[in-house]
């Protein structure tokens, strides 16, 4: 559908000086603005070189003008692009001329919002535009481009279609009880439901990797006092971010460093040494450390390799801890290899435990750790397999997963087809929030307001 509305204008290029600057216009007055500024009729989708005029035929600049009649444009509306010189004064003069002729200044993200409202792209694709602009690594940029091209949306639509087909079957059985379809006896519903859950789990895992590449991975360095945690933080940061002494308990609070590995963002957190203590200040530091561990994407459990310790990371956590992190997101760091004489190695056991021997002091093995962290973020994905995702996408996928699990329990434990049908509907609605099929105005406002002006 085409949303007839006022005409908007904005500078579409980054602030500052450059060789080229672009003013973008969208809305029903775009054609009139083109005629007034260029003083001639523009052939659609052709680049026209010439002066850009202000009042009283006073030239403001010269460059290329391109007119895109709707609906075959980015926003689905009539669009005008004026590509002139990239000086801020010149661009401001050109933008002010557009406003004098009836346009208004666009809000941040309003061009992309109109493209979404006019069905030119869905919400996940619109967000991918911002992700592509803000990408901090080559792989993050590739993933954002694939999302912009619809790869993530395609996966979500496939899940939604499977849910719709399952809902049709379940609701038909409920509406026509004379058919006497036994949900459990024929096995069709459970089989289809488990298939959707498996597909959803795959998409959720890949979306999680995409979110890490976009937002960065939170890595928490944990362990007992004097294991070398702060030395490891300093080695990764490349500077003296934390105080290092031989006194146990030097670090009493969490320290955060934001670093990049080959352009990939990492949020590294150093924590207080984990031990049962009567010192009130140190106990607060331990509590904050445990909170950080629970929120981490990856935990580096640092142990002193010169001390006789067990090799199982789960057994290495202090006995007083009531809850310990999932071993699947823990890397055991056997530090001080320069003192113990251990070889610098990265090993993965049969049960999936990852152990890395290194020396934070000498930096031996540090490159192995960097490569390992990159792999945890999905750096080794092929260009054909990744897509960009955001935290809100993960929340929606998790919601859908919970609804499907709840619906399965309702069916298998109670034989409640009506309750299953409602859970299927809610799961479909959760998926729809990703692409914008089900989205409140408040959600749309928050998303598009985070965009650049002119996008």
UniProtKB/Swiss-Prot annotation:
Mg(2+) binds at residues 230, 251. Signal peptide: none annotated. K(+) binds at residues 226, 245, 247, 250. Residues 216-378 form the TrmE-type G domain. Keywords: Cytoplasm, GTP-binding, Hydrolase, Magnesium, Metal-binding, Nucleotide-binding, Potassium, tRNA processing. One of its GO terms (molecular function) is GTP binding. Its cofactor is K(+). The keyword Nucleotide-binding applies. InterPro entries: G_TrmE (IPR031168), GTP-bd (IPR006073), GTP-bd_TrmE_N (IPR018948), GTPase_MnmE (IPR004520), MnmE_dom2 (IPR027368), MnmE_helical (IPR025867), P-loop_NTPase (IPR027417), Small_GTP-bd (IPR005225). It is found in: Cytoplasm. The keyword Nucleotide-binding applies. GTP binds at residues 226-231, 245-251, 270-273, 335-338. (6S)-5-formyl-5,6,7,8-tetrahydrofolate binds at residues 24, 81, 120, 455. Binds 1 potassium ion per subunit. GO terms for cellular component: cytosol. It is an enzyme of class 3 (hydrolase). CDD domains: trmE, TrmE_N. It comes from the Bacteria. GO terms for biological process: tRNA methylation; tRNA wobble uridine modification. Its EC number is 3.6.-.-. Pfam families: MMR_HSR1, MnmE_helical, TrmE_N. Homodimer. Heterotetramer of two MnmE and two MnmG subunits. Belongs to the TRAFAC class TrmE-Era-EngA-EngB-Septin-like GTPase superfamily. TrmE GTPase family. Exhibits a very high intrinsic GTPase hydrolysis rate. Involved in the addition of a carboxymethylaminomethyl (cmnm) group at the wobble position (U34) of certain tRNAs, forming tRNA-cmnm(5)s(2)U34. This is tRNA modification GTPase MnmE. The lineage of its organism: Bacteria, Pseudomonadati, Pseudomonadota, Gammaproteobacteria, Pseudomonadales.
């Amino acid at each position: 559908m085409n949303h007839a509305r006022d005409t908007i204008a904005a500078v579409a290029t980054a602030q500052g000086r450059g060789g080229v600057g672009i003013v973008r216009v969208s809305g029903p007055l775009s054609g009139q603005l083109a005629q007034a500024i260029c003083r001639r009729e523009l052939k659609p989708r052709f680049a026209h070189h010439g002066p850009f005029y202000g009042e009283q035929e006073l030239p403001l600049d010269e460059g290329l003008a391109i007119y895109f009649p709707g609906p075959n444009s980015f926003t689905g509306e009539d669009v005008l692009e004026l590509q002139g010189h990239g000086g801020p004064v010149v661009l401001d003069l050109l933008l002010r001329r557009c406003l004098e002729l009836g346009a208004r200044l666009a809000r941040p993200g309003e061009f992309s919002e109109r493209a979404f409202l006019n069905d030119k792209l869905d919400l996940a694709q619109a967000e991918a535009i911002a992700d592509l602009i803000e990408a901090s690594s080559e792989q993050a940029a590739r993933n954002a481009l694939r999302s912009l091209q619809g790869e993530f949306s395609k996966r979500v639509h496939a899940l939604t279609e499977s849910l719709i087909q399952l809902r049709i079957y379940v609701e038909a059985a409920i509406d026509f009880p004379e058919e006497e379809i036994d949900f459990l006896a024929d096995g069709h519903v459970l089989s289809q439901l488990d298939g959707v859950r498996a597909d959803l789990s795959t998409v959720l895992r890949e979306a999680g990797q995409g979110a890490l590449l976009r937002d960065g991975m939170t890595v928490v360095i944990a362990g007992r006092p004097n294991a070398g945690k702060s030395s490891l933080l300093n080695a990764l940061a490349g500077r003296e971010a934390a105080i290092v002494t031989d006194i146990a308990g030097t670090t009493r609070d969490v320290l955060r460093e934001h670093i990049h590995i080959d352009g990939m963002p990492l949020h590294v957190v150093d924590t207080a040494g984990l031990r049962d203590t009567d010192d009130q200040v140190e106990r607060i530091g331990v509590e904050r450390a445990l909170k950080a561990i629970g929120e981490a994407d990856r935990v580096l459990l640092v142990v002193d390799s010169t001390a006789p310790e067990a090799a199982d990371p789960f057994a290495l956590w202090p006995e007083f801890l009531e809850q310990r992190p999932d071993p699947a997101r823990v890397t055991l760091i056997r530090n001080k290899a320069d003192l113990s004489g251990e070889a610098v190695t990265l090993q993965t056991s049969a049960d999936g435990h990852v152990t890395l021997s290194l020396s934070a002091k000498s930096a031996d093995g540090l490159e192995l750790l960097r490569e390992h962290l990159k792999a945890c973020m999905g750096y080794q994905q092929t260009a054909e397999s990744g897509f960009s995702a955001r935290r809100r996408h993960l929340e929606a996928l998790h919601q859908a997963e919970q609804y499907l699990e709840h619906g399965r329990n309702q069916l298998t434990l109670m034989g409640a087809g009506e309750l299953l049908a409602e859970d299927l509907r809610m799961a479909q609605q959760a998926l729809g929030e990703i692409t914008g099929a089900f989205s409140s105005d408040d959600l749309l406002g928050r998303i598009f307001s985070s965009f650049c002006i002119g996008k």
